[in-house]
Amino acid sequence: MNRIIITIFFYLVSLSLISQNITDALNYTNNNIDGSARFSSMAGSFGALGGEISSISANPAGSAIFNDSYFSLSFASDKKSNDVNLLNANNTQDKSNLSMNQIGGVFVFNNIGAAKKWKKIVLGISYDQTNNNFNEFFVRDFTNSNSIDSYFLANAQGLRLDQISAFDNETITDAYVDIGNTFGYPHQQAFLGYESWIIEPDSFEDNNTSYTSNIAPGTFNQTYYSISRGYNGKLTANIGAQYSEKIYLGLNVNGHFVDYDNYNILEESNSNGQEGSLNVTDVNFENRLSGFGSGFSIQLGAIAKLTDWLRLGIVYDSPVWYEITEETRQYLATRRIDQLGEEFTEVLNPNAINVYDAFTIQTPSKITGSLAIVLNKFGLINFDYSRKDYSSMEFRTIDGYEDTHFSDLNWAIYNNLTVANSYKIGAEIRSNAMSYRAGYRIDGSPYADTDQYSDRTGFSLGIGYKFKSSTIDLSFEKYNKQFNHHLYDAGLTNQALIDNDNTIIKLSITSIM
């Protein structure tokens, strides 16, 4: 009866929150324009150039460079290769997938305005993939002195037994859902640990708040899998205008979407127990996190022709205001040997989806400056510099409040993230109908500690062939970064060092409309 009364009270006043972390924030808010083959082959360095459909997403003034209406469509093959090191165990895992990563068009309206100072207005609409979330890595059969029991103990200590256990004749599903809705995420994890026999109370009184483990200390054989799916994308409505012969202006209104799904599994076994005592010898723990939502942002940009061959560009990207909803599913199975040597298997499969209250994320704003040299029909070169302060990223409830959980998370973001500087340089050489392209970029780490997450560096190459009214382009990109992946946020916090290589091949078709 005690928990029933508390259930009603908490249902009225509390929010059900999962323990979001900095990694979740970066996964959701990654906004790196994928773009067309031409755009990508020059490392996305188009800030002072324009005249390319994907460049509109980088600088909205780029649409005003077009003299004709254009349509563009791109396809990408994306391969991620992860070299994983965890407690001196190594594994390499590759994952590839195909996608339509870009589509868009612009419509040019020339000779507007009575004074003829406004040379043209351009309307554009485009879709660009901003993050490919398809990824996999795993490490098999590594030896650890830390058990998964530490995760359940970290969540359980200090919680009342009657708040993390099922009532008599209550199903696992009913108890799991009720405890999650009533008390929140840590209680739900403690419930799984208790009902699976991994943890045991010091006493079986309702007010007990101290727990020990039924997994004997020693060494543990573990295997860890992480599988991610989904995409982040950006839909842009653009208006651009040319004023006189030297000034190009643009505005983007952007809709963003997030579709992220992560599934991880930990398998653990041990032979540490002694005869005559209860020992949990095997654990299989599965977690699935799904996050999806939408956001809104604007961009303001300008390009100035200082001379016939020299251009400057500047862009302001507003924060993206996201609204995110998360869902989780869990499964836990254990095998134990009791004091008499008999074996038992416990399977906790709630068959329930936890839907958590929506929350908002405000990403950092960004400022970009660009310089380009255009050598008539012979070629061009462009340099972009961007600055983005990740420490200003902020979580809030859907009502705009910063509760205790989000206050702690925002404080962690402020203390661990920093200003990221990005540098891109791209060049194109033209020879009759052929174009040859190359680029290089450095995307600064959002972390103050670059050992936690390194800079992302890479190069790109590409070619293009121009027909009478259309162009076909092909690009090759290769990027590298290293980062640490925590197995869990509490207890079992070992870190896997991941060396990630990303190879992307794109094909684009562009045509005059």
Specify the residue positions occupied by each region the protein language model found.
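Bacterial Sec-dependent N-terminal signal peptides
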Residues: 1-25, 513
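N-terminal targeting signals for Sec/Tat export/insertion, comprising classic cleavable signal peptides
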Residues: 30-48
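Outer-membrane beta-barrel translocator/receptor signature
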Residues: 37, 49-58, 64-137, 141-142, ...
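Short, charged, low-hydrophobicity "junction" segments
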Residues: 43-51, 412-415
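Outer-membrane beta-barrel porins/channels
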Residues: 20-34, 108-513
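Short structured motifs
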Residues: 58-59, 493
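Active-site-proximal flexible loops/turns
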Residues: 9, 66, 259-261
